A protein has these predicted regions:
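Catalytic-histidine neighborhood of serine endopeptidases
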Residues: 1-34, 41-44
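Short, surface-exposed secondary-structure boundary micro-motifs
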Residues: 4, 77, 129-130
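Extracytoplasmic
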Residues: 7-10, 20-22, 32-36, 67-69, ...
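C-terminal cap/linker of serine protease catalytic domains
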Residues: 25, 47, 127-195
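Active-site substrate-binding loop(s) of clan PA
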Residues: 26-28, 44-78
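Active-site region of chymotrypsin-like
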Residues: 42-58, 81-156
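Secretory pathway targeting signatures of secreted, lumenal, and periplasmic proteins
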Residues: 206-211
């Protein structure tokens, strides 16, 4: 998706169905801060080989507010080995983090990024985004996906038609995020620490770590 956004004249997006059939798709909107995109696939082609009209199946969006220790399930295609389901533990939101992500105690591997994380009811509660190894993985809360989806009209004009429009969209999101970030940093009074005869700034924000 990133390549199609940065160079829409060189790359295209396709969706692959469970039976291996590919359909053209288009990027409708993105959330560059949370590494999300809304993609629309072309309508399923006519009639399946059985002669019955195609019926698409979709996942439902849930919420990311659970008790720590809840079992959840991450889906993806690790190392292009085939669709896999990884069971793990929900360990809440990372509060002392610049971006609120879900801490997932489970093994997310390359190829699983962008896949859904589900609760026992099969509802999407997050999106695979990254891993630190040793079963320390991170999910984007599904609420960010719901917000992005709500911004897309029923019949959108795809921004991907122009690389220039995409760059403008990305720039707007980055600027807005940086403005909020700097405001958080500068608004509160800084705590001072006494070191000998000097006073130095203490913790600016709890999202900054020294390790």
């Amino acid at each position: 998706v990133a390549e199609a956004v940065h160079s829409p004249a060189r790359f295209r997006v396709e969706s692959i169905r469970h039976d291996g059939v590919t359909d053209p798709a288009e990027v409708l909107d993105i959330d560059v801060i949370h590494d999300l995109a809304i993609i629309r696939s072309a309508p399923l082609r006519g009639v399946e080989r059985s002669g019955h009209e195609s019926q698409a199946t979709y996942l439902s969006l849930g919420h990311s507010d659970f008790s720590k220790g809840t079992r959840i399930f991450s889906m993806g295609n690790p190392f292009d080995l085939g669709m896999s389901i990884v069971e793990g533990i929900y360990n809440g939101l990372m509060e002392d983090s610049l971006y609120k992500k879900i801490l997932f105690s489970g093994s997310i591997n390359p190829g699983m990024s962008g896949g859904p994380a589900l609760n026992k009811a099969g509802e999407v509660i997050g999106i695979n985004v990254s891993t630190a190894g040793n079963e320390v993985s991170f999910l984007v809360p599904v609420e960010h996906l719901a917000q992005l989806h709500a911004r897309v009209p029923a019949a959108p004009d795809p921004l991907g038609m122009s690389g220039t429009r995409w760059k403008k969209r990305i720039g707007e999101q980055l600027t807005e995020n940086q403005d909020q970030y700097v405001k958080r940093l500068l608004d509160p009074a800084w705590n001072a620490l006494v070191v000998g005869e000097a006073k130095v700034p203490g913790e600016l924000l709890n999202v900054f770590k020294c390790w």
